[in-house]
């Protein structure tokens, strides 16, 4: 009798059915995440068919094509040069640095073998080929204590690693922990301390702190002993190591102690001058990028003279920053009562807020202004002690040589001041020097009456000299636009004004030196409380006779009138608010200084505004009814035909008429690191990716990975716009080589304090410096055909609760301290993209804020590019209809459409068409069109991975069915034979 295989067929049926179900589910899921899967697998979704001849279609050629190896060398060199000009020498007692060639050194802390190269999250970088500090120093001629290195790298000290929160679904989870090696373990390691004397020219201690996307640095929750919860303070293990190194220096084992600050966030710096630690020199190196360690080694050994200047105020203790009591985790006390909730694991919050109570007084603008008022006896400064709080001010940086100024001159015309000064290298070491020009505006009775604030000094211009040899001089000339004299008057004129009174310009070695120069020009001396004498000879006074409310009340870029746009972000002007904010004011420092979190209670109207229900519109602003646009026309147009035509050329209407509603919708709402192809107009798909330090990660669709440059904060610290142009050009070339058409960078959010998780990704605490450094980078990237998305526009200055946190600030601060960082990239460099914020401005999501995206960005600044949201899949408030109304064009994410149900709504249909017009206008003039002629057709194809899925589904469907048939047949046969 033949054996019955019923059980076998049953098992096979179940197994194949399970695989079939898996294939079906995989097919559904991968097609839902179609964009991301294509990006990850580098899959083509279309092919180009071109039967005609249209000349050269390499519109943006790769000038390094065929020379990839040489380009890599150039990238390495530029990375090192950026670090060389950005690293800041903070301290150098008795010329402890440079160490000289052949120095024998010992590297301390686990961070010496595991340095910070960038940040985490969207700005993470590929540093797989980066030379470590040991290799860099050895290449520079130093000898390294390899026994100590091995102890940290692979020995008993290797398990002591930093803990940094990991980014998951746009929210970082985990703890910040320093976790450095205890000194007791070093002492216990057999023979380790015996090696120190042989490598005793210097003990180099690396202090590293990491930041990243999704979570701010811990102010009270750091788990390391001795920090009191402050991640930017020294841990007990670090303190013990530094104390032990001092003891070893005192007994002659080490000659000097050098600290490297490997952090883009300003640490508490009081310890650097604490005699308990005996530190001789300190060098801030930030996030060094892939090859920045080569420059760090050059600075330490002396082949490079540091010329970087601080872009933030470095405090002895960051607790002195006035913003900290209103930072990170603030919750409306009556949120639950008003029906507001926090949902989706902090990926969507309706209950959190932050008040920028410090107003314009960010960073040095607070510390220097209160210092000046203390000296002059103005504004009730109280017992303020500048020297006890500030370690190094904005713009500070030492050199291995000395520079001197002479022949300071200022001329002026109706548009600008022109400042010139001679800079002479008075030392023996060749070096570069940064010339910094600061302006002081008068603080008038009108200002006090109308709530206008003025900092004692504001950066107004800068330039870096060439390399100057001993006794060599250079005359540096800097233009200062008179527009910088303006201040925003929200409560009086409702526009920009120029106050009557005395304005000062001065050249200063840093912000504090600038204040002292102006105080000297006013007749003050050290006898009045100045901590050092200033130079009146380095100042210029200009007197504005009358208050001017007209000159800057109209946009120079567009001719539009400028007026209040952000009343609803200021709790003192927002009609629904019952909270009054006492903003920090130099009219009464002691009485207005923030001492506790500003408590904000939600009103009924505020709760309604937070809900922000969509209200359909039927007529435009002129009273004309909206009508449905044309779809699916056959006009014979292709996108390539529009190349070079103005945005308002009539031909655009014919092109847009060819598209379907579905095509337009698919492009707009599914723009996670890409935009879809549009067959009706032969639009190719595009690839966009992150890139604050360069296009360094192929995860989202790049064909290769480029070099990771130093963090943006180091770029800014070069104070060298020529380097920014070089960096931008190289990032653009990276885009061409990786087939990346757009880059989510640069970013110009402000270092409101040292604890923002993404300070590494932003330039500075100062909006002027941020804007001046970002603009040339933007231009250079776009000159290569790669469009930028400057981000995060705007007021995304913390990571905690970033998905929905409500930012409350006054209009002067919003415009002067934050938005000003972005303006030059639009008005001068014509940025073609902006990425919005996840948070809210007042109660309104930034991606739907018409005041920001339409009235200011497009209306005042003349922006004609694409606005894309930040990642929007997790938050229900990132409503597409409202975003289109506000001025957003693309949604970075994948989620169900809010637009489909309104495809017959002429208002929404026209907004969608407007968004597509903007997108196409940018992309047709970009590298996305390389290889596509006006006669080319984009033909959709099934991707290889889809074909694989379809075949697998079909195969296991057939196998399941066949096995099921055999199983049933076996059962019947068994019954028959029973």
What is each stretch, according to the model?
Residues 482-558:
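Terminal connector regions
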